[in-house]
């Protein structure tokens, strides 16, 4: 063969410049060609077959030269050129290719070892790919070497790919034979020829990398040790030392640096490599720059290819530019991770400020738990009192005990904030002391004195939040000691000195916050606020604290604080001292109580002990370190430290030794007792299991998402099927969102589901930035798909680039095409030129639409929120929210990723941080997503995330903002998911899907319960479900715990077992399309298999003993049947558990058989039941005597339908029309119906607007003594509600007291038990219209969630309010309305006000109405309280009323005085004749003797006028309603409605006509009534003289009297009634609200009631589910009126529902004869015979179905209302970097760098009115907030729990977004004022109207939210 020296003669000039000489294979060097030829003849390496004629010398002209430079740029360029010439020559001379390669190797491995040569050689190694390029001479050889698993690297070294090591080319054949067992028979000669290659041996590579200070490019194919150790002092000295073994590194530090420098100060992590060699005895490591370059350069176009068109060029350029954009982000990220340890941005002082005033809340709850409702647990309280008698201790402290533990303190220079800040610094200084101690010394401070082998002793706190919380607890104890009367002066003195030193340091200009940040450099990952710039999550592995020295002030402050802590925590008490007198017990006693004095649960109290115990131990450790530093003790005397009499024991260990009567001992023993109580206490009864598939959970009381209609004693029912519905609902939303985010692309075709199984993922790969996304070419090629889709689609292109045409885009990307090759070749140089990076970026040159980007980002944020919830629900047992927010997609600098691919699923492989912190042990927890969710998440990360990153870059022009999209799994509004967001996201998402607000804690309990009851079968100790949930099996079986056992090893089936756990949970949730693809093979346990075999053998033996003779066919048949039966049993047992009660009710009802009835319905009119009429008349007689009659038909209908309990009613009767009887009579009948000893009474809930009305109604009910009523439901709050619980018959409550969360839950419990008969709302028009009850109105819709009919009562209920009522309560109402609101017995008198004649006119009116006679009374209504005082003063001063007593009724009068005045006015024998009051007195006050009502000034509305005039003539006698008005009010007054103004200005309009049109929607007048007193406008007489009226219209001076109001019938109850329907009358009173037939007010007798037709023959479709006849009931969803409506008096809600589903028919207890003997349930037979019907199940079913639909409507309404605030919150998170004031001013403006507060548009104007001539303080506009937070403008429903609402520390999103000022600015903007006024203010553009609207809470949503949402969504359309 030809040796290398022959080819060396063809060396070029370039090669000479590099090497300086020619080298023969034997190693001899030559400087010219002649000498090498002579040497070749004598060289021993010369091949015998080679002759001298073969030696050819090439002329220099044939050499390849570099004309531009004397030296080559990179070695490969010269090498390839030389090789090309060599190959050409070899072809001419037919030389073997191997010889050419040998020559190349000889040239590149020159013996010249100058720096330039070495640098050029190692530049070539930047090509980390194998040397397989087409132009390389290694290509053919590498193809053949690949067959043996070998490859030649670009560093000219031979590598074994399988062993990942470099080989010496001489020993290659031996390596393949011995190590890989290959037989090299024919190829042995070829391996011997490889020896001629001059490849580097491993030794040469190590020698080349001998320097331990330089950083070399890493060698691809060899393993990289990412966490190697580098000696910092050696590196600074220039010598350097690196190693991968900690012990060796420690020996080096001790040997080289001694004990002067601590080991922690020497260590620095770095990436290392070593060349593995079989013959190397010791490993030599060298530092490498671990930055693998991505390939994927664009292939050059081949010659002869046709020119691409513009579209193809654009698409190719987009893909290229996008790939370059992603690579730049990757390299920037890796460079930051590689060497630039950026200073952390979080500030401990800021964190302290943010956590100020939260110590009490933090001590009362766990880190990831939600607050519980404050209720007293008597058993727990007694247990604690038995042990500690804390209640007595608190009593001795006095009434102001809560001030002792108040987290606020300022006394001179001693402030709480200063103490907390210095305590934080003290903790971190103590941590440094602990790091210098050995583990044995730290174990001396172990809690309890006992430790396991894994216990590290007293360790530093991992989380920064924990440090702050512990510091706050210790500070609170110090403040407690200072506040005590007998406070230790020493503690105060030291704290004052400490605060003084702190003040001096601050005045000196030192930055304490930066020092704290440096001290806190090793905070854990949970508290890392890295601003998404890097992936640092500093833990104890990287606690390189450089700032170890502090100045004198810091040292002085530290020493003074240490002395104060010693006095507080290192205490030893006298054994004779009572424990209750200790300061620590007094502190714990105060902390054990809520602010209202109720006891906390034991688990709430337990949070107080850990900070105090840890502080006590840490102070002792610091004191020991002080003794060591001062040389008072020697480390050699460690064994005697805990010996009594030693200095260490006397100063340190006696205070932390148990049994020595010290503070530590008291805390430790108290904690043990509390923990024992916790084990029996549970979790405050928050979860109750009803069945394996049903639970009851207790939601938070202050949740902004209330549970409507499903409460059981404040607990909510949840079925397993609802979890399935929750997952399916969220998954459907996520699918739709992904479709929108991908612009309706066919993602299934682009990224099929098979991709999950085809992508490879190296789980053990710890390379920086590695993730499985890099392993698939499909993924890498799909990053730019969405961007190319935008550019190709015209609609999308216009949406994102509205100002650019397609030609502009094509031209822009076409210009990049010419520079593509240069940019690829000079990529690194281009990237390093940061100054021109943004200018040359093509994406920054595009004119993007910021609104389109924000909308896209908002959708993506919603997607991430739902994806977070889906992962939390379906991945197995739920994880912790604090850990989920840090899950990453790729490997970071100090932690590996959490997202992996395994078993064809996405696997989340997280580490349990809490175990790591406590035990210093890893606890890896795998969770597997379902297959549908896996592919959906994968498509999102592959397609959408790159586009999000690009959009973030173009909006900010900052690549550091892009890293968060490439790193974290969940990104919200451009930031990593914050720690507090999950607690808002999860309840909101669950409420939107299933209308039940599941909190994190609720779901963790529920998931554990369902798992225990449906999946976990064996009581094994190691449960993979419990490991996923974060607790051990033993803990899970007791109290839901937190600690875990160590996992000593990972078995081979570790991941498979977790996969099985996740899959079983997903199977329980019935997740569809989730196959296992055969990966889960459930094998039978060997023991069970053995039992089955024995059973088969036993059966065979028994068969033989019996002697059965079976033919072959019978055997086969029997065997087939047996197998069939086994299969059926197996299939039945393997079916998933399904809750049969949770199916949709309507589906079950469709198949529920009903029993046939004994009669048939007759179409036509329906009539009331005879028995029901009897009962109504009997109850009426109990109230008003035997002669009482119903005043009108409508009144009877109201009573009767209320008794039926089948429909929701609106009863509109005139004042004095007997509306109260509609619930009093049914309540009395139901009370008599109850069965003694079995079922207790039904309850009626009555809501009234005013306290006076409540008192008046309760007084009237109590006077009769027939019913028991109560005005306070809270007295029964703590009573356990059952069917036998004795309750009042009536609850008469005000709106505010009943419509609270706790009140609604109480009545929901009653309704669930079937004991709530009806809900009555008196004066319902006020609830729906008046602003005084806006807060109550926001909760009024929840009344529809009660399983009881609604009954709205009012005398003034306009028809327009009917639609408002339907929308508010989400149901239809049946309306009972009298034809005219105006009363027939009242003379309506209108007269202009004359100040001089007013008193005289008043006296004249009082004489006409005989107020001065008998029990006559007069009421004067005034608009304001000033008017009341004015009239009252004039009457007292006037001689006309000298002998007349006058009283007043206003809001300023106390309750006692109001009640006294009202009693005096109502007393028939009293002297008080006149009541002067505001309109509050006009609501429902029932006094029959009011003869005159006077209005002093105009009422605000027609409803107020009708309501107040209705106080007169309630007994049916003649009365006058006089209105004195001023001309100004009727024209210009702002508080009077326009309708009232028009009415007064039109002198021809009849009063009754006006009231009828406004209230009833009818056109009538005084002449339309057959028997009425004409109004002043229809009468010729000024005052309507009675004689004139009588003469003109033939009526008596006084209307017919009726004894008592309202009511009466005959005393005969046994009258014979016909059971058959009466003949159809010609003209009957219809039920429809549109019926305008007049109805007589003549009392209705019993005989007339028996023939009354209650329902018309036809029903309008408008009133579905409200009324109907027999043949239309089912059509409109009504119950059958012919069936007895039996409520659940004897059964609970569950039994009632089960009976409905199972079709159980209840017996109908009919009652005949006298009411006095009533018992059981009264049937209501309407239009039927005497036979009993069996259709009660259908009746109750339809009623229950209507109720369920009503509840669903209310839930939807509530969700819609809360979703508006959630949308705005999400919007402001997205737009947090933009000034929205500028956006409102000019929607097309560019993104502003300033914030809203610094907006130049806003700085020059007033905050409120927007004017520039004054500032905020000088503004005359006065704004008063009602029901809103003064600092953010939100209602309490819109606040989160952590917002600290209604305080100056409010942290809501609205305050951060300046919502109030933004709305003010929009109103003061001319272009929005008219728009807002038309939308919300009926066109009123006055400032007073606007601020009155936005600053008062009217609904669940704040008006500020409604206004800004309307502007952003409907007007600007940017939401």
Curated annotation (Swiss-Prot):
Compositional bias annotation for Acidic residues: 360-372, 524-533
Catalyzed reactions: Couples ATP hydrolysis with the unwinding of duplex DNA by translocating in the 3'-5' direction; ATP + H2O = ADP + phosphate + H(+)
Domain Helicase C-terminal: 1401-1559
Pfam family for this entry, one: DEAD
Binding-site residues for ATP, renumbered to this chain: 1213-1220, 1240-1247
Gene Ontology MF annotations: 3'-5' DNA helicase activity; ATP binding; ATP hydrolysis activity; nucleic acid binding; zinc ion binding
Domain of life: Eukaryota
Start-end of CCHC-type zinc fingers: 1804-1821
Enzyme class, UniProt record, top EC level: isomerase
Residue ranges, annotated region (Disordered): 329-372, 504-552, 1110-1135, 1613-1643
Biased composition (Low complexity): 540-549, 1626-1642
Biased segments, Basic and acidic residues type: 329-347, 1112-1131
UniProt GO cellular component terms: chromosome; chromosome, telomeric repeat region; cytoplasm; nucleus
Record keywords: ATP-binding, Helicase, Hydrolase, Isomerase, Metal-binding, Nucleotide-binding, Zinc, Zinc-finger
Induction remark: Repressed during various growth conditions, including nitrogen starvation, and by heterochromatin. Repression is strongly dependent on cul4, raf2 and raf1. Derepressed by histone deacetylase inhibitor TSA.
Gene3D superfamilies per the UniProt record, alphabetical: P-loop containing nucleotide triphosphate hydrolases
One annotated GO biological process: DNA recombination
Function statement: A probable ATP-dependent 3'-5' DNA helicase. Has a role in telomerase-independent telomere maintenance. Represses ade6 at an ectopic site.
Family of this protein: Belongs to the helicase family. RecQ subfamily.
Protein name: ATP-dependent DNA helicase tlh2
Organism: Schizosaccharomyces pombe (strain 972 / ATCC 24843) (Fission yeast)
């Amino acid at each position: 063969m030809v040796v290398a020296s022959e080819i060396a003669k063809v060396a070029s000039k370039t090669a000479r410049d590099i090497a300086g000489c020619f080298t023969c294979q034997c190693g001899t060097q030559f400087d010219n060609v002649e000498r090498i030829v002579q040497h070749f003849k004598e060289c021993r390496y010369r091949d015998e077959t080679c002759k001298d004629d073969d030696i050819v010398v090439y002329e220099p002209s044939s050499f390849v030269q570099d004309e531009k430079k004397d030296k080559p740029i990179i070695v490969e360029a010269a090498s390839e050129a030389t090789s090309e010439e060599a190959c050409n020559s070899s072809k001419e001379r037919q030389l073997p290719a191997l010889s050419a390669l040998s020559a190349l190797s000889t040239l590149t491995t020159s013996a010249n070892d100058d720096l330039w040569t070495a640098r050029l050689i190692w530049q070539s190694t930047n090509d980390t790919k194998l040397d397989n390029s087409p132009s390389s001479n290694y290509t053919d050889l590498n193809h053949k070497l690949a067959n043996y698993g070998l490859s030649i690297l670009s560093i000219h070294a031979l590598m074994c790919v399988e062993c990942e090591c470099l080989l010496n080319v001489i020993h290659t054949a031996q390596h393949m034979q011995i190590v890989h067992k290959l037989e090299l028979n024919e190829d042995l000669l070829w391996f011997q020829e490889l020896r001629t290659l001059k490849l580097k041996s491993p030794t040469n590579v190590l020698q080349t990398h001998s320097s331990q200070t330089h950083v070399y490019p890493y060698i691809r194919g060899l393993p990289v040790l990412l966490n190697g150790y580098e000696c910092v002092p050696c590196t600074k000295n220039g010598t350097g030392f690196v190693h991968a073994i900690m012990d060796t590194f420690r020996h080096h530090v001790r040997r080289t640096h001694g004990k002067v420098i601590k080991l922690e100060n020497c260590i620095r992590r770095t990436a290392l490599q070593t060349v593995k060699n079989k013959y190397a005895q010791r490993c030599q490591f060298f530092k490498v720059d671990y930055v693998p370059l991505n390939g994927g350069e664009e292939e050059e176009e081949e010659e002869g290819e046709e020119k691409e068109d513009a579209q193809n060029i654009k698409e190719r350029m987009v893909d290229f530019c996008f790939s370059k954009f992603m690579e730049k982000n990757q390299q920037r990220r890796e460079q930051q991770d590689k060497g630039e340890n950026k200073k952390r941005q979080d500030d401990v002082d800021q964190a302290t400020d943010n956590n100020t005033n939260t110590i009490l809340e933090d001590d009362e709850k766990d880190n990831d738990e939600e607050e519980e409702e404050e209720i007293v647990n008597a058993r727990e309280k007694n247990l604690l009192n038995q042990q500690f008698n804390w209640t007595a201790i608190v009593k001795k402290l006095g009434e102001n005990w809560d001030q002792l533990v108040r987290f606020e303190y300022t006394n001179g220079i001693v402030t709480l904030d200063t103490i907390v800040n210095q305590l934080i610094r003290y903790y971190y200084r103590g941590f440094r002391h602990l790091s210098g101690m050995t583990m044995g010394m730290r174990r001396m401070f172990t809690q309890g004195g006992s430790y396991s082998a894994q216990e590290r002793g007293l360790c530093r706190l991992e989380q920064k939040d924990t440090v702050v919380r512990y510091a706050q607890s210790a500070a609170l104890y110090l403040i407690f000691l200072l506040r005590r009367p007998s406070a230790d002066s020493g503690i105060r003195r030291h704290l004052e000195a400490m605060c003084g030193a702190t003040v001096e340091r601050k005045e000196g200009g030192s930055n304490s916050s930066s020092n704290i940040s440096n001290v806190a450099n090793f905070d854990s990952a949970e508290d890392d606020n890295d601003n998404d710039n890097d992936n640092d999550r500093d833990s104890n592995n990287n606690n390189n604290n450089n700032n170890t020295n502090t100045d004198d002030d810091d040292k002085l402050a530290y020493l003074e604080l240490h002395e104060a802590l010693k006095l507080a925590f290192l205490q030893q008490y006298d054994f004779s001292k009572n424990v209750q007198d200790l300061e620590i017990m007094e502190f714990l006693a105060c902390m054990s109580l809520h602010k209202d004095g109720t006891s906390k649960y034991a688990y709430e109290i337990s949070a107080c002990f850990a900070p105090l115990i840890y502080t006590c131990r840490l102070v002792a450790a610091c004191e020991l370190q002080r003794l060591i530093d001062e040389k008072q003790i020697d480390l050699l005397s460690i064994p005697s430290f805990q010996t009594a009499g030693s200095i260490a024991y006397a100063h340190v260990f006696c205070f932390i030794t148990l049994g020595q009567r010290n503070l530590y001992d008291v805390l430790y023993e108290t904690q043990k007792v509390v923990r024992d109580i916790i084990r029996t206490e549970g979790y405050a009864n928050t979860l109750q299991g009803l069945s394996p598939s049903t639970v009851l959970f207790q939601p938070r009381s202050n949740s902004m998402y209330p549970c409507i209609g499903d409460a059981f004693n404040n607990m909510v029912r949840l079925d397993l099927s609802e979890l399935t519905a929750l997952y399916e609902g969220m998954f459907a939303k996520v699918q739709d969102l992904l479709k929108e985010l991908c612009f309706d692309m066919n993602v299934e075709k682009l990224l099929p589901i098979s991709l999950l199984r085809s992508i490879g993922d190296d789980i053990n790969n710890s390379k920086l930035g590695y993730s499985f996304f890099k392993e698939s070419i499909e993924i890498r090629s799909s990053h730019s798909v969405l961007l190319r889709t935008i550019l190709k689609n015209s609609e999308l292109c216009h949406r994102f680039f509205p100002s650019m045409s397609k030609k502009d885009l094509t031209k822009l990307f076409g210009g990049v095409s010419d520079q593509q090759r240069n940019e690829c070749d000079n990529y690194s140089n281009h990237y390093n030129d940061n100054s021109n990076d943004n200018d040359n970026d093509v994406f920054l040159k595009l004119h993007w639409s910021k609104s389109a980007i924000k909308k896209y980002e908002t959708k993506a944020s919603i997607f991430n929120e739902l994806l977070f919830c889906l992962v939390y629900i379906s991945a197995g047992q739920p994880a912790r929210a604090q850990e989920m927010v840090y899950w990453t997609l790729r490997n970071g600098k100090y932690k590996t990723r959490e997202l992996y691919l395994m078993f064809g699923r996405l696997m989340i492989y997280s580490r349990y941080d809490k175990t790591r912190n406590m035990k210093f042990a890893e606890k890896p927890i795998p969770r597997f997503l379902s297959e549908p969710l896996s592919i959906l998440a994968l498509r999102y990360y592959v397609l959408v995330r790159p586009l999000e990153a690009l959009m973030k870059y173009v909006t900010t022009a900052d690549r550091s903002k892009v890293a968060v999209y490439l790193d974290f799994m969940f990104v919200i509004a451009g930031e990593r998911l914050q720690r507090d967001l999950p607690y808002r996201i999860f309840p909101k998402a669950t409420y939107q899907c299933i209308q039940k607000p599941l909190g994190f804690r609720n779901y963790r309990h529920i998931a554990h319960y369902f798992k225990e009851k449906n999946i976990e079968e064996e009581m094994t100790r190691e449960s993979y479900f419990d490991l996923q949930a974060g607790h051990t099996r033993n803990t899970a079986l007791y109290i839901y715990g937190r600690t875990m056992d160590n996992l000593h090893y990972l078995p081979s089936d570790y991941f498979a077992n977790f996969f099985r756990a996740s899959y079983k949970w997903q199977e329980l949730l019935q997740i569809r399309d989730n196959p296992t693809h055969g990966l889960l093979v459930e094998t039978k346990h060997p023991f069970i298999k053995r039992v089955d075999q024995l059973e088969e053998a036993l059966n065979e033996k028994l068969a033989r003993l019996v002697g059965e003779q079976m033919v072959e066919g019978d055997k086969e048949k029997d065997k087939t049947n047996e197998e069939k039966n086994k299969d059926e049993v197996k299939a039945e047992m393997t079916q998933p558990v399904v809750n049969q009660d949770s199916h949709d009710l309507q589906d079950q009802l469709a198949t529920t058989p009903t029993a046939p009835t004994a009669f048939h319905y007759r179409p036509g009119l329906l009539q009331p039941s005879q028995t029901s009429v009897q009962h109504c008349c009997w109850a009426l007689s109990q109230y008003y005597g035997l002669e009482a009659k119903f005043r009108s038909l409508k009144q009877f209908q109201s009573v009767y339908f209320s008794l039926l309990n089948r429909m929701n009613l609106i009863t509109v009767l005139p004042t004095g029309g007997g509306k109260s009887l509609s619930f009093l009579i049914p309540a009395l009948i139901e009370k008599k119906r109850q069965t003694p000893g079995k079922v207790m009474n039904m309850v009626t809930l009555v809501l009234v607007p005013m306290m006076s009305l409540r008192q008046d109604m309760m007084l009237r009910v109590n006077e009769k003594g027939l019913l028991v009523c109560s005005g306070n439901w809270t007295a029964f709050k703590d009573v356990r509600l059952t069917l036998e619980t004795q309750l009042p018959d009536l609850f008469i409550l005000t709106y505010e007291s009943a419509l609270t969360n706790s009140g609604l839950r109480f009545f929901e419990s009653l309704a669930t038990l079937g004991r709530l008969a009806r809900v009555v709302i008196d004066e319902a028009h006020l609830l729906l219209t008046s602003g005084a009850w806006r807060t109550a109105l926001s909760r009024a819709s929840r009344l529809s969630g009660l399983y009881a009919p609604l009954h709205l009562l009012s005398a003034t209920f306009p028809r327009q309010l009917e639609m408002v009522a339907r929308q508010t309560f989400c149901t239809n109402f049946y309306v009972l309305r009298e034809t005219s609101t105006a009363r027939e017995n009242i003379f309506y008198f209108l007269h202009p006000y004359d100040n001089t004649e007013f008193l005289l006119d008043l006296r004249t009116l009082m004489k006409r109405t005989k107020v001065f006679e008998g029990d006559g009374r007069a009421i004067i209504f005034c608009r304001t309280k000033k008017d009341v005082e004015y009239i009252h003063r004039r009457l007292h001063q006037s001689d006309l009323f000298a002998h007349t007593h006058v009283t007043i009724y206003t809001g300023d009068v106390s309750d006692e005085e109001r009640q006294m005045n009202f009693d005096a006015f109502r007393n028939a024998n009293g002297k008080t004749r006149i009541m002067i009051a505001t309109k509050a007195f006009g609501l429902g006050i029932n006094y029959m003797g009011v003869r005159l009502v006077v209005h002093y000034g105009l009422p605000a509305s027609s409803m107020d006028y009708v309501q107040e005039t209705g106080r007169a003539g309630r007994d049916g006698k003649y009365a006058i309603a006089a209105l004195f008005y001023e001309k100004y009010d009727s024209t210009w007054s702002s508080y009077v409605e326009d309708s009232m103004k028009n009415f007064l200005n039109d002198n021809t309009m009849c009063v009754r006509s006006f009231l009828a049109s406004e209230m009833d929607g009818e056109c009538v007048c005084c002449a339309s009534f057959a028997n009425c007193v004409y109004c002043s406008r229809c009468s010729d007489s000024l005052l309507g003289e009675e004689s004139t009226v009588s003469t003109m219209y033939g009526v008596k001076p006084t209307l017919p009297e009726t004894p008592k109001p309202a009511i009466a019938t005959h005393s005969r109850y046994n009258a014979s009634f016909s059971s058959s329907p009466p003949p159809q009358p010609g003209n009957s009173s219809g039920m429809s609200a549109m019926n305008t037939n007049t109805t007589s007010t003549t009392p209705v007798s019993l005989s007339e009631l028996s023939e009354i037709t209650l329902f018309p023959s036809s029903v309008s479709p408008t009133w579905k589910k409200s009324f109907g006849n027999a043949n239309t009931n089912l059509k409109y969803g009504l119950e059958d009126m012919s069936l007895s409506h039996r409520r659940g008096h004897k059964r609970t809600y569950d039994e009632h529902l089960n009976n409905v589903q199972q079709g159980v028919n209840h017996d109908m207890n009919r009652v005949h004869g006298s009411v006095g003997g009533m018992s059981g349930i009264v049937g209501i037979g309407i239009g039927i015979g005497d036979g009993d019907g069996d259709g009660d199940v259908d009746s109750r079913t339809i009623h229950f179905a209507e109720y369920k639909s009503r509840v669903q409507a209310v839930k939807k309404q509530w969700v819609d209302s809360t979703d508006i605030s959630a949308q705005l919150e999400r919007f402001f998170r997205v737009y947090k970097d933009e000034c929205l004031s500028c956006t409102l001013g000019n929607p097309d403006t560019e993104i502003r760098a300033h914030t809203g507060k610094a907006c130049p548009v806003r700085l020059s104007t007033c905050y409120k009115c927007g004017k520039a001539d004054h500032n905020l303080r000088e503004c005359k506009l006065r704004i008063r907030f009602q029901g809103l937070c003064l600092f953010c403008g939100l209602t309490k429903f819109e606040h989160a729990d952590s917002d600290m609402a209604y305080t100056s520390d409010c942290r809501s999103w609205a305050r951060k977004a300046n919502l109030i000022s933004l709305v003010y600015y929009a109103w003061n903007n001319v272009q929005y004022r008219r728009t807002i006024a038309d939308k919300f203010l009926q066109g009123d553009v006055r400032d007073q109207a606007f601020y009155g609207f936005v600053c008062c809470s009217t609904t669940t949503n704040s008006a500020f939210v409604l206004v800004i949402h309307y502007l952003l969504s409907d007007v600007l359309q940017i939401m």
